[in-house]
Amino acid sequence: MKRFITLLLLLALTTALLTGCHGGKKRVAFRVPMEFDESKQYEISFWAKNDTNITQVNIYRQAIADFEALYPNIHVNLKTYTDYATIYQDVITNIATDTTPNVCITYPDHIATYQKGSNVVVQIDALMADPNYGLGGSKLKFDGPTEEEIVPKFLQECFIGDGHYALPYMRSTEALYINKDLVTKLGYDIPDVPTWDYIWEVSEAAMKQDADGVFLVNGQTTLIPFIYKSTDNMMISMLKQKDAPYSDSEGHVLLFNDTTKEILYSIVPHAKSRSFSTFKISSYPGNYLNA
């Protein structure tokens, strides 16, 4: 399932599909200032997800460095998380003590929960429309996108209740990467449309070892034939492929069915043989691609 990631702004200085908090100050309704005071020092806390991927962390750090070079009176404090659920829980926990971040990455459906607090999340419609500092603003020191340059469907997902409370950050997707050299070495061709039966068969074939525990296909003592980043998405995709339900638009949970049980039982042997692993068990799959 492709999930839409947003930056939510919690009552603070910034706007974007980020969630931000007040800290120890009394929360008051946000108003767009007439001017940006460049003589005043600002400190912004930013909570982001990086999947333990140092490449992502370095991208955040570089973006922050570039931003601070343009705005030397703004200092961004980055805190990274390995999953969205922990960010979500930490924001909720910190709302009570006014120690939420100024900006954070979130899913749109998390925003409704944050809104239960008074003046916790900033409605940013006025800021988006501001001719100076809004979308495509004339006084921005960088080439900011105009509203017309944002995919309308993505922006619509940031409209929660009575207005916009976030800006689009990224749309995730998934792809199947195949090590052609290893698969060919095992004696298999790569089909135009790989099936689960094909994936499991090739993965099990790759598990063959010699007497010393060395994998025959790569000559090493370590091998993960098949790894999936998100087991949530894996289940959603497998149910979709079998025309089986997962949930509906009204929020009903439908995944507890015979097809789900069948899928789980089909995966068990490959988990036991260790021909299959996940992000939670091993690591971020991209780390292996970058190795």
At which residue positions do the language-model features occur?
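Extracytoplasmic/secreted envelope proteins and their assembly/folding machinery
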Residues: 57-64, 88, 92, 108-111, ...
